[in-house]
Amino acid sequence: MHHRDLLAIIIISALLFINVILWGFILRKYLEQKEQDRKEREILERLRRIREIRDDSDYESNGEEEQEVMDLVLSHGFDNPMFEP
């Protein structure tokens, strides 16, 4: 092998390695975003259920459901002043 061939193999290997690292980073960010979206959907679904129950005429709130949603929001790291205690 000539030095030029060896240098080309090293450069191609380095570029492939960088490509794998980059795609791994992108995949990790995508999965984190997907998990965040799932948590948001769960919270919104609980809030929707609470509102539906509240719209019923016989709804008596002891604050337990609202506190459960607030704890869920805070435990998932959402930073929304509406949910601050």
Curated annotation (Swiss-Prot):
Primary location class: host cell
Residues in compartment: Extracellular: 1-7
Location of the protein in the cell: Host membrane
Keyword Membrane: yes
Post-translational modification summary for this protein: Phosphorylated by host CK2. This phosphorylation is necessary for interaction with human BTRC and degradation of CD4.
Domain of life where this protein originates: Viruses
General remark: HIV-1 lineages are divided in three main groups, M (for Major), O (for Outlier), and N (for New, or Non-M, Non-O). The vast majority of strains found worldwide belong to the group M. Group O seems to be endemic to and largely confined to Cameroon and neighboring countries in West Central Africa, where these viruses represent a small minority of HIV-1 strains. The group N is represented by a limited number of isolates from Cameroonian persons. The group M is further subdivided in 9 clades or subtypes (A to D, F to H, J and K).
HAMAP family to which the protein is assigned, alphabetical: HIV_VPU
Descriptive protein name: Protein Vpu
